Amino acid sequence: DEPKPDQFVGLM
C-alpha cells in the first residue's frame, strides 16, 4: 500500500 497524501500530512 503506497502512503496516501492524507497519511503524509498526518506524519507532519
Swiss-Prot record:
InterPro entries given for it? Tachy_Neuro_lke_CS (IPR013055), Tachykinin_dom (IPR008215)
Quote the Pfam families the UniProt record gives.
Tachykinin
Superkingdom of the source species: Eukaryota
Residues with the modification Methionine amide, per the entry, are M12
One record GO biological process = defense response
> What residue ranges carry the coiled-coil annotation?
none
What are the subcellular locations of this protein? Secreted
One GO cellular-component annotation of the UniProt record comes to: extracellular region
The reply on keyword Oxidoreductase is no
Keywords, ordered alphabetically: Amidation, Amphibian defense peptide, Neuropeptide, Secreted
Family to which the UniProt record says this protein belongs: Belongs to the tachykinin family.
Q: What does this protein do?
A: Tachykinins are active peptides which excite neurons, evoke behavioral responses, are potent vasodilators and secretagogues, and contract (directly or indirectly) many smooth muscles.
Give the protein name, as stated in the record. Hylambates kassinin
- The record lists the organism as Phlyctimantis maculatus
Q: Identify the taxonomic lineage of the organism of origin.
A: Eukaryota, Metazoa, Chordata, Craniata, Vertebrata
